[in-house]
């Protein structure tokens, strides 16, 4: 039986969960709610929610959201490098065990399995870093248990790794949606002026779309029928070649 060429299809979905073995990693997942004189600490869960929001805003052609994705991407690269350095130090310590002693995986008998809902690639990259930290914590606890490192070294490595992730997660706490798109900026309308007053000026490569994060989403721009369509950002030369004196259309119909 022949299938119709344009058979209706639903959205693709997959079920994902993250398995954590240490309290150190679980605390970084949840973060901390503000209480009394203690300020709140954003965990991975809150970080992912903010990154999903920024990713969605960037897809709507918001140049300020694109600037945030670049900042987050740079911070992720730095965090990854710092965790790799800690992992290298730990690996050196574990090699001090005699060849006759086989050290197996240090796994929790009842690990925590957390459902994962991530809609942005940068959220996944942060999740991978938390999984790496969980492994680092497990192996460091094993190294201390087998006298390959002392307790102060264990605490220092655990805290250094946790600080790297907390610094990453806290980066997005101040994000606010600007409510503008590149057409607003080009038109110099009231929305653009308000955004500039609140969030400042942006570098030209971000404004013209030539500088975007590696995992930036395709842009959705209003089509002739008022519906958002994915469209590449033109480069600066194309913009100059097609310049006209017509008014720039707004972002939304």
Segments (PLM) and residue ranges:
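Short, hydrophobic/aromatic alpha-helical segments in well-folded domains
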Residues: 139-140, 157
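Conserved hydrophobic residue
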Residues: 148-149
């Amino acid at each position: 039986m022949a299938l119709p060429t344009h058979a209706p299809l639903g959205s693709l979905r997959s079920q994902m969960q993250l398995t954590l073995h240490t309290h150190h990693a679980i605390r970084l997942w949840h973060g901390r709610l503000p209480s009394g004189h203690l300020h709140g600490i954003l965990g991975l869960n809150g970080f992912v929610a903010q990154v999903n929001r920024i990713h969605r805003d960037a897809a709507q052609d918001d140049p300020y959201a694109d600037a945030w994705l670049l900042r987050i991407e740079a911070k992720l690269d730095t965090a990854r490098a710092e965790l790799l350095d800690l992992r290298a130090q730990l690996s050196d310590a574990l090699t001090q065990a005699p060849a006759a002693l086989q050290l197996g995986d240090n796994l929790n008998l009842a690990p925590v399995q957390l459902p994962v809902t991530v809609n942005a690639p940068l959220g996944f990259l942060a999740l991978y870093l938390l999984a790496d930290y969980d492994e680092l914590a497990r192996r460091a606890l094993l190294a201390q248990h087998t006298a390959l490192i002392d307790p102060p070294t264990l605490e220092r490595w655990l805290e250094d790794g946790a600080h790297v992730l907390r610094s990453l997660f806290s980066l997005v706490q101040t994000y606010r949606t600007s409510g503008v798109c590149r057409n607003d900026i080009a038109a110099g309308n009231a929305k653009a002026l308000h955004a500039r007053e609140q969030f400042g000026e942006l570098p030209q490569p971000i404004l013209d779309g030539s500088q975007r994060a590696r995992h930036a989403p395709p842009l959705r721009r209003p089509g002739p029928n008022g519906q958002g369509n994915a469209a590449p950002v033109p480069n600066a030369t194309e913009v100059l070649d097609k310049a006209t004196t017509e008014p720039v259309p707004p972002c939304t119909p």
